[in-house]
Amino acid sequence: MDAPIFTGNAAEGTTDLFETDYYGQPAYLTQSGQLYGEAMAMAMGKIYTFGPTFRAEKSKTRRHLSEFWMIEPEMAFCDIFENMDTIEAFLRAVVLEVIEKCPEELEVLGRDISKLQTISKTFPRLSYDEAVEILKGHKDVDGQNSIKVLEQDLLTVEMRITEVKADISSREAAITAGGMKKGEINFNQNKIDSQKQELKQLEEDQRNIPNWLKSARDFVYGNDFGGSDETVLTRLFDNPIMVYDWPHEIKAFYMKRNPEDPRFARGVDVLAPEGYGEIVGGGERETSEEWLVEKIKEHKLPMDVFQWYLDLRRYGSVPHAGFGLGLERLVAWVCKLDHVRETIPFPRYYGRLEP
């Protein structure tokens, strides 16, 4: 289905909305087609939307765009665990098809296909509590400790920086000294250029790892994961991981509470490996009108614009769930791109409106 791009209400929160005038009324560029997808799923059973979404986030990270495309399935008679099964099957099918049909393109991009072939393995599923324990180094994963791994990675990076700098200096000195044939000069210069690119990445890691360590050690239970936290977690896995059952305060108002422990919302985030972080967000939707009204008030959202959404519960609802997959983030991970803006011809992100 096609969800509207103009909307009178927020889907994810009011702090990152692009507001515009709609014939004298305030309107917003859509953050998600999900709420409309829920309405259609009640009639059709299983639906999906695919369209542009907009977030006014003043972020300059390599993961953020202000305008991007999302695929958003919504399924009636579906709970969080069936939703996670669907997400896993969907991602696996997409990645395996790319590997099968685009091997030459991946080779041109320098993508190590073996890093993608692990998609055939079952995705690890962690509760928020488990993920926090792993992040802070209180729980190991297959004998690996997040803090110790980072500390060792930092030592390895520093040693490699020393080696690369020494080799670059040696090759540059040999070229300057003369006596080399043209082919030898070209070979060494190409090697130097390659090593300088490697050195750039190594020095970035040298700057980042101490920050990741501090963020992991200082992480406060109950907070959402930031980019550095997602990076630390995913360094211990070679496949996307699913983190579910989040503190309800940090999830959207429409997330269903865990009936066995109402402190948690039945949301799930899928974090891609190799530092790419969240590529899918989803969960089971709240079917209780009473809970929804409470959450709308808690999030300080205008009740009047959500009456149509509350009507979906007043006049009969069923368990349902869904997710949103950010297309550009998925492409960035599959192709191992440095920045999500490389995935789209004319990117829109904080500070860029042209061309």
Regions found by a protein language model. Give the residues of each.
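Active-site lining segments that contact anionic ligands and/or coordinate catalytic metals
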Residues: 24, 45-47, 68-70, 238-240, ...
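Catalytic palm subdomain of template-directed nucleic-acid polymerases
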Residues: 76-86
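Class II aminoacyl-tRNA synthetase-like tRNA-binding/catalytic domains
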Residues: 1-78, 247, 251, 332
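A residue-level signal for conserved active-site and pocket-lining positions in enzyme catalytic cores
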Residues: 29, 73, 131, 243, ...
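Solvent-exposed residues in well-ordered beta-strands and their adjoining turns
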Residues: 74-78, 92, 273
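Active-site pocket scaffolds in enzymes
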Residues: 273, 281-355
